[in-house]
Swiss-Prot record:
The gene is greA. Belongs to the GreA/GreB family. Disulfide bonds: none annotated. GO terms for molecular function: DNA binding; RNA polymerase binding. PANTHER family: TRANSCRIPTION ELONGATION FACTOR GREA. It comes from the Bacteria. Residues 2-30 form a coiled coil. One of its GO terms (biological process) is DNA-templated transcription elongation. Keywords: Coiled coil, DNA-binding, Transcription, Transcription regulation. Necessary for efficient RNA polymerase transcription elongation past template-encoded arresting sites. The arresting sites in DNA have the property of trapping a certain fraction of elongating RNA polymerases that pass through, resulting in locked ternary complexes. Cleavage of the nascent transcript by cleavage factors such as GreA or GreB allows the resumption of elongation from the new 3'terminus. GreA releases sequences of 2 to 3 nucleotides. This is Transcription elongation factor GreA. The lineage of its organism: Bacteria, Bacillati, Bacillota, Bacilli, Lactobacillales.
Length: 160
């Protein structure tokens, strides 16, 4: 059985490595200390501080495991390997809805780097899936929960 790969830019991988370091060197020791303090309160069966600290420990360990997996199976995507005007991971694309002047800007990132509020959409999202591989000037049909609409790719550039 082959493992899932996680396409991402080198910058995304470096960000994950920083998050992992923060979790291992700061958050994990903080949680361990909270558990130690909560244990000192005595009876663990009715110790809400202990339960909360154990829940946080499970959350932190889950994050560590998830990030380690993403780093281990990272597939670094070189956006320079595709045409300058082609949409790919590591590129920012400006699209205009056909029939309007409404423009949107998206940076295509691996799933680990997605942040919709910052305009970073996962390569696995329906919008990115429709755009990846297309070029400046192409018209693309986007399927969304709100309905289908057509966009024209106005500009593609490397994400900074």
């Amino acid at each position: 059985m082959s493992e899932k790969t996680y396409p991402m830019t080198l910058a995304e991988k470096e960000q994950l490595e920083q998050e992992l370091e923060e979790l291992k060197l700061v958050r994990r020791p903080e949680v361990i200390e909270r558990i130690k303090i909560a244990r000192s309160y005595g009876d663990l069966s009715e110790n809400s501080e202990y339960e909360a600290a154990k829940d946080e420990q499970a959350f932190v360990e889950g994050q560590i495991s998830s990030i380690e997996t993403k780093i281990r199976y990272a597939e670094i995507v070189d956006s320079d390997a595709v045409a300058k005007n082609e949409v790919a991971i590591g590129k920012t694309v400006i699209v205009r809805e056909v029939g309007t002047n409404d423009e949107d800007t998206y940076s295509i990132v691996g799933a680990a780097g997605a942040d919709v509020f910052a305009g970073k959409i996962s390569n696995e999202s329906p919008i990115a899936q429709a755009l990846i591989g297309k070029k400046t000037g192409d018209k693309v049909m986007i399927e969304s929960p709100a309905g289908s609409y057509q966009v024209e790719i106005v500009k593609v550039k490397k994400t900074k």
